[in-house]
């Protein structure tokens, strides 16, 4: 069996997109297994995750996102920008659209000005212990690693995120990130961001839950870091977030957070399902 796919990325955070707007292509029970196979960088197409375009009874379209390990997540900031560009380009929705996600219905605007740009109303960041969720108050919680002490702060921007503010990002973030990601404090696990603030510019490196490694960019993480930094009085309400993959612009208001960034459609192709490796 052969199925069509599209390869996209938002600031280097890359995805395989499957269009199920006209009907189911990959059965629900098969989706985790399929995603693990197609996202494998040696035996599949290779990606940080997979996007599924589906019809919605509540909005213009329905967004589904799976991490490369096959787990489904409520939201992905870079993913929803790519998704939105695709559905506008294919004529499934207009340039102002409403998208159903597991994190709620989001409003977006797609613009074509020197490339494709998508502005996402990400909703209001949540800081409550039960909203993150966390077993204890983690606002300023101290973590010790390799003889050093770090303070962590958490927010939920569709998925849980921890921010660790540092003076330098020139170190291997993975060991400490994994310690925090798998801490019993976070019953659902968490994404972990390391951030360096310079005025209203924040440089961020993110370890993503479900990918289980550092990615080139994370949209929900960028929003979370900006919201936490603003709450701590480190930045203003408009912030440039610099990731390894590129720039995201974050704007915070009393009621919501807006994220603006690019969305690239790299190529379209055909998958031969019988050639994928499902045993890895």
UniProtKB/Swiss-Prot annotation:
The gene is dapF. It catalyses: (2S,6S)-2,6-diaminopimelate = meso-2,6-diaminopimelate. Keywords: Amino-acid biosynthesis, Cytoplasm, Isomerase, Lysine biosynthesis. This is Diaminopimelate epimerase. It comes from the Archaea. The record marks 161, 208 as: Could be important to modulate the pK values of the two catalytic cysteine residues. Pathway: Amino-acid biosynthesis; L-lysine biosynthesis via DAP pathway; DL-2,6-diaminopimelate from LL-2,6-diaminopimelate: step 1/1. Catalyzes the stereoinversion of LL-2,6-diaminopimelate (L,L-DAP) to meso-diaminopimelate (meso-DAP), a precursor of L-lysine. Substrate binds at residues 13, 67, 77-78, 191, 208-209, 219-220. Homodimer. Belongs to the diaminopimelate epimerase family. PROSITE patterns: DAP_EPIMERASE. It is found in: Cytoplasm. It holds the Pfam family DAP_epimerase. GO terms for cellular component: cytosol. GO terms for biological process: lysine biosynthetic process via diaminopimelate. Gene3D superfamilies: Diaminopimelate Epimerase, Chain A, domain 1.
């Amino acid at each position: 069996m052969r199925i069509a796919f599209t390869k996209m990325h938002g600031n280097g955070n890359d995805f395989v997109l499957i269009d199920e707007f006209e009907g189911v292509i990959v059965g629900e029970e098969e989706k985790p297994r399929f995603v693990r196979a197609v996202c494998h960088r040696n035996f599949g197409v290779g990606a940080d995750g997979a996007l599924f375009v589906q019809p919605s009874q509540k909005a213009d379209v329905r967004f589904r996102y799976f991490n490369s390990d096959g787990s489904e997540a409520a939201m992905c900031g870079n993913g929803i920008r790519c998704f939105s560009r695709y559905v506008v380009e294919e004529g499934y929705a207009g340039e102002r659209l409403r998208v159903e996600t597991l994190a709620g219905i989001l409003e977006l605007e797609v613009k074509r000005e020197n490339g494709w740009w998508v502005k996402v109303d990400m909703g209001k960041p949540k800081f409550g212990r039960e909203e993150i969720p966390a077993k204890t108050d983690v606002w300023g919680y101290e973590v010790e690693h390799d003889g050093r002490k770090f303070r962590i702060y958490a927010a939920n921007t569709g998925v849980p995120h921890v921010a660790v503010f540092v003076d330098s990002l020139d170190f291997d973030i993975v060991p400490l990130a994994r310690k925090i990601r798998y801490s019993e404090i976070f019953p659902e696990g968490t994404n972990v961001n390391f951030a360096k603030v310079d005025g209203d510019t924040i440089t961020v490196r993110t370890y993503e839950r479900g990918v289980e490694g550092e990615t080139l960019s994370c949209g929900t993480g960028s929003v979370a870091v900006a919201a936490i930094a603003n709450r701590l009085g480190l930045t203003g309400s408009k912030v440039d977030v610099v990731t390894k993959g590129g720039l995201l612009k974050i704007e915070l208001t009393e009621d919501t957070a807006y994220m603006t960034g690019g969305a690239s459609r790299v190529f379209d192709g055909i998958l031969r399902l019988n050639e994928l490796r499902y045993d890895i």
